[in-house]
């Protein structure tokens, strides 16, 4: 089982369980799970439906709202990346709790900033607080991984549907 999450203009994803894509009444709205805001973060969320969903707090448009810059132009040492990593990690903890996946793959334009991965993994471990005591979850270097396929995963995935 696994999950792919794209973090870019929006946040979305899919979950595979027993070799099948999870699909119910609608597609999973992985970007619209509600997460607690970090204390002191009072910049209005970019989601018009929620005030604290992961998409509204951590997508590319929110990075631009916070800094006035596109994600690719924000320096790696900007404090906004710490907040970004925290919010993504909050979401990943929730996905782990709900779907119990064996691996989480992160892609999308925001995740092209590879320096985010260690930050996300550290917050993930901190937020999970040892609740799930499984070796594969504890080894965050292999549990939370960057997407491969050089940014073509969406196109290749779509082609595999035909």
For the regions a protein language model found, what residue spans apply to each?
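Glycine-rich phosphate-binding loop of actin/hexokinase-like ATP-binding domains
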Residues: 1-55
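ATP-binding/phosphotransfer module of carbohydrate and carboxylate kinases, centering on a glycine-rich
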Residues: 21, 37-162
